Amino acid sequence: RALADMAHAQGVRIWFCELTPWKGYTRNLFGRGDDIQWSPELDALRLELNAWFQSADCPADGYIPLGPLADPNDPDALVPAYTTDGVHHTPAGQRALAALMPENIFEPQTQEE
């Protein structure tokens, strides 16, 4: 909220994107073992944040749903062609993500907003 307030004070609009599914991802930071691994409990946090992003309480000026990136056969995961590790997008995934961005996202904020 504080970052959004600072941005708004400078005339910058804030857009939030839906946090994409990440089932299948495991991070092994610095070879110390699996320090982050997908679980239903962690995924519930993603869903909770996505719900907040869409709520009236969220300070964002816009919300970008990314549902088409989810695997229709496993909505907790990305489309297999869009990722190799479960979270980072392949070039095909990046193109699909870019196609979901609204054209007006880069328009300057007007005084009425």
Range-by-range predicted roles:
Residues 1-8:
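Surface-exposed amphipathic alpha-helices with a cationic face
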Residues 9-14:
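A short helix->loop->beta-strand "cap" motif at the edges of active sites that frequently abuts
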Residues 20-113:
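Catalytic His-Asp segment of secreted/periplasmic serine-dependent ester chemistry enzymes
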